[in-house]
């Protein structure tokens, strides 16, 4: 795409979810890519930080946050800034934005909430729309759609509309889970990211504790059968035509890939994954098929399980705003596929303008 003038990119980051600091780290990476030697003559930047209370902070101060080299503790001082608050719909700062780049992970961001708000500005955004974001975040809806389309998944149960403050309810549900699924199981909030609120349970008492932990985050819960698997991931970019990255694998020393493992220095990311070409092509085909099924476009990361003994492939989930941190798989996948972070960010902007 030929650009005649600098495009103003509006980065939105922070937010009220438990992934607040991950969002800040992702935004810093994108900010550095936009001011790189490759991109600095192509783009202008406005940034909008949303603090933990849901308050939008003005662009000048938000850019200061992205320029900070300190650790995440520095952001605590930005939680109470009554004189720097802005009203989204009435503020002139938003009128000069050409393209939005929302980097809000988790609830009130990745779930389509921010996409709906930004639609009122009538400006393009990087990523998919409201419906794809909402379904991609909701593990129950996503799994039900995949089941209807015979996309392979691990066996699962969905729990909705139960009062898990009642011990008898938790006890009865744990019995049902043991009857219907092989142990161990993974108990997950339906709407959560970065493995927050997820537990591995090997017996009834652990299931009861896991249900309580998940319910504290979301009243809707998914229980999945645990298998002996490798964890593989594929990046997706594009609109009408979706392109896939190389396949990556996450190797970890812990019992399973929990929140601490995801952001641990002990992880090993292997790109390309040590798999044969047939499995690689199957994963890429399933990644495109699943994104099409949920109306997901722009960019996403699709996660898979590869059962070690049977070599069966199972789709795990789709992340519609995958992490852009220095430890995140998505930019690493595309770097291995020929796009460094500066090129990747510019490519995503071009894709949004072509949509």
UniProtKB/Swiss-Prot annotation:
InterPro entries: ATP-grasp, ATP_grasp_subdomain_1, D-Ala_lig_Van_CS, D_ala_D_ala, Dala_Dala_lig_C, Dala_Dala_lig_N, PreATP-grasp_dom_sf. Disulfide bonds: none annotated. Its cofactor is Mg(2+); Mn(2+). The keyword Magnesium applies. Binds 2 magnesium or manganese ions per subunit. Keywords: ATP-binding, Cell shape, Cell wall biogenesis/degradation, Cytoplasm, Ligase, Magnesium, Manganese, Metal-binding, Nucleotide-binding, Peptidoglycan synthesis. One of its GO terms (cellular component) is cytosol. Pathway: Cell wall biogenesis; peptidoglycan biosynthesis. Mg(2+) 2 binds at residues 317, 319. PROSITE patterns: ATP_GRASP (PS50975), DALA_DALA_LIGASE_1 (PS00843), DALA_DALA_LIGASE_2 (PS00844). It comes from the Bacteria. Its EC number is 6.3.2.4. It catalyses: 2 D-alanine + ATP = D-alanyl-D-alanine + ADP + phosphate + H(+). It holds the Pfam family Dala_Dala_lig_C. Belongs to the D-alanine--D-alanine ligase family. This is D-alanine--D-alanine ligase. It comes from Prochlorococcus marinus (strain MIT 9515). The gene is ddl.
